[in-house]
């Protein structure tokens, strides 16, 4: 995947999570950067980004392979707690809705989501 494709897919994921109130305690790693649903005020160089549904934060450069054991630096890797964790792992009333939707978002790019830990996933060809 190109950097542009990774970024477009990431923004589609963020929009879906924002629309469904699951964009809390979510971290996304792509193109050598760390993006987050949460702002850390002590981090002065954070860049505020926006979608039509809300804000997300570019936390700067990051080597995802130093953060998550099961990562794919060539696409998108995610870590999460909160609402996405509960839905993705089958603990909510709409269990696995996020699993299905994330795979629908990934499919046009020839990718699928694979869970590493209960709190992480990465996209693969």
Task: Please describe what each predicted stretch is.
Residues 1-21, 25-28, 114-125:
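Short, extreme N-terminal segment that most often corresponds to the first beta-strand
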Residues 35-116:
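Acidic, low-complexity, intrinsically disordered interaction modules
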């Amino acid at each position: 995947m190109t950097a542009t494709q990774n970024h477009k897919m990431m923004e589609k994921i963020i929009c879906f999570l924002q629309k469904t109130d699951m964009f809390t305690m979510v971290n996304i790693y792509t193109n050598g950067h760390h993006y987050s649903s949460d702002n850390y005020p002590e981090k002065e160089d954070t860049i505020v980004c926006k979608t039509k549904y809300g804000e997300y934060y570019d936390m700067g450069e990051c080597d995802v392979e130093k953060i998550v054991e099961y990562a794919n630096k060539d696409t998108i890797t995610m870590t999460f707690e909160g609402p996405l964790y509960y839905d993705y792992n089958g603990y909510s009333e709409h269990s696995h809705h996020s699993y299905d939707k994330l795979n629908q978002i990934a499919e046009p790019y020839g990718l699928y989501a694979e869970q590493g830990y209960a709190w992480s996933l990465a996209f693969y060809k």
